[in-house]
């Protein structure tokens, strides 16, 4: 029941149904060959300027020693303002100890944003960091790092944080 979270006027609840696997369960594992909502559903709110999507890719050099970490962050702005925001990324090891001395960061505004839809604009930002001698993931030693990506407004207030594991 989300009644307490509704505001006076129009409220929008979006539903997105994926027909492909996200690796959390194997498609067709239970012989269901249909689309639709047949599992648990969760609902959450997001800020008006938010991280719509992101990717983290670690690419090893030709000697398999060091890596280049490329992080792409897709921002959506429902305010359609040109305020400045900062995207920060911090990398943690398996014990959640920081790998970097300080977060990778980039500041951006939406002056050159593209239209996402009639209600929002969109901007993609990229962060890059060299990683010296990272632990390598393999089937024998499946080492995973955690990337935490934070979106902050011009006053340094955290608006949203997302994370993923990578290796």
Kindly label every feature range from the protein language model.
Residues 1-167:
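Secreted/periplasmic carbohydrate-active enzymes, especially glycoside hydrolases
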């Amino acid at each position: 029941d989300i009644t307490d979270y509704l505001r006076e006027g129009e409220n929008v609840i979006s539903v997105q149904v994926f027909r492909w696997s996200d690796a959390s369960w194997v498609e067709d594992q239970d012989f269901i060959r249909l689309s639709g909502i047949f599992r648990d559903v969760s609902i959450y709110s997001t800020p008006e300027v938010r991280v719509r999507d992101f990717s983290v890719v670690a690419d090893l050099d030709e000697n398999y020693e060091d890596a280049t970490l490329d992080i792409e962050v897709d921002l959506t702005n429902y305010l359609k303002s040109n305020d400045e925001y900062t995207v920060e990324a911090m990398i943690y090891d398996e014990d959640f100890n920081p790998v970097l001395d300080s977060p990778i960061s980039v500041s951006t505004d939406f002056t050159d944003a593209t239209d996402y839809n009639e209600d929002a604009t969109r901007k993609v930002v990229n962060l890059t960091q060299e990683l010296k001698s990272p632990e390598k993931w393999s089937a024998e030693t499946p080492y995973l790092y955690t990337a935490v990506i934070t979106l902050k407004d011009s006053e340094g207030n955290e608006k949203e944080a997302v994370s993923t594991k990578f290796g």
